[in-house]
Amino acid sequence: MNLKQIDTIKEKIQPILSEKHLLLWDLSFFGGSPAVLTILIDGQDHQAIRMNQISEVTSLISDALDKVEPDPFPDRYNLDISSPGIDRSIKTDEHLDWALGQPIKLNLFEKIDGSKSAEGILKSFSDLEISLEVSPAEVKNFPREKISKISLNQEA
């Protein structure tokens, strides 16, 4: 699936989510047999969502996607709609902005200070780095190009 198709899907589902006072957290597509379209949704102001909301939105989104032309899914696929969960992945600057002041975990491509991960309170971020308060008196900066994954860390 290409970026244009993903944008088309986002355009189709965004009004549905807005009407139901929900936010799109993430969207991913994995080819396979069958392929899987995963849509992660969250409540406005990042409030918890209920299963009945997920069920209702799944039906509405499925109907909307069935009407997209040209069909982005000519073959069979599974639609998976769920909450991003408490240890949600943080992928965009919007996600980082939301996570400011919260505990996060970084997975790194290579060791920094002897470790391939870091945990702390997200203090700030820029295009180049992410700053974590790793202890009450210590803030460390991590280059974004060395970070493989960022997630909320509710275990902290």
From Swiss-Prot:
Keywords: Cytoplasm, Ribosome biogenesis. It comes from the Bacteria. InterPro entries: Ribosome_maturation_RimP (IPR003728), RimP_C (IPR028998), RimP_C_sf (IPR036847), RimP_N (IPR028989), RimP_N_sf (IPR035956). CDD domains: YlxS_C. The keyword Nucleus does not apply. The keyword Isomerase does not apply. Pfam families: DUF150_C (PF17384), RimP_N (PF02576). One of its GO terms (biological process) is ribosomal small subunit assembly. It is found in: Cytoplasm. GO terms for cellular component: cytosol. PANTHER family: RIBOSOME MATURATION FACTOR RIMP. Required for maturation of 30S ribosomal subunits. This is Ribosome maturation factor RimP. It comes from Oenococcus oeni (strain ATCC BAA-331 / PSU-1). The lineage of its organism: Bacteria, Bacillati, Bacillota, Bacilli, Lactobacillales.
